């Protein structure tokens, strides 16, 4: 990989990981237009690590409070709002784990193509618009409850289909279930931690068993750029949605879907 490819793909991964616009749709366009080959497991580890570090550092206080409350609840059997939130996020992670292990090969073989990505980009963009218009004041992430957490978890599992967008699917489900925009985004971002950590472990496992040469320059640069892009993305996304809602991202998804359709039929 040359430096330009590393910069472009790392920034795309960092920016699109937490915006409801689908990272796979953005990663496929440079590959299609510029003829780039697959970036390899080493680079996947780098950009996933950068994104994971960004959300952990940005929400470090919340995650620390949740972790200490959760571990305390295991001993005392008494629940606080932080420990409940931790349990709900654990519950919401289960569907993605099950679906990921059972459908991984099918998705990679049959659904990882530009036609599917174009369709899901448009369809889930329209669903995001519907959920955002349906939403009013909403409630906070501390009022989710186990039923809603599980439903949002199923949405996260569905996001394994390329083009859906993990944050897009979970935010859409959270809005439809009554969370406020900011709470939906925060819950989605917190949900990403166990999923991203698990995915990173699996990728590292695959990397250790492969014969792929490690490009340390791409590793360091990809991690750093992905971290910075993801951190800034989280910060400004939470500010934008409080004022403008999801409409800009819906319009962007529809435009991107249209571009992908042009690429398909060109």
Curated annotation (Swiss-Prot):
UniProt keyword terms in alphabetical order: Antibiotic resistance, Cell inner membrane, Cell membrane, Cell shape, Cell wall biogenesis/degradation, Hydrolase, Membrane, Peptidoglycan synthesis, Transmembrane, Transmembrane helix
Enzyme Commission code: 3.6.1.27
Membrane topology: Multi-pass membrane protein
InterPro entries membership: UppP (IPR003824)
Keyword Cell inner membrane: yes
HAMAP family: Undec_diphosphatase
Entry's family note: Belongs to the UppP family.
Descriptive protein name: Undecaprenyl-diphosphatase
Gene responsible for this protein: uppP
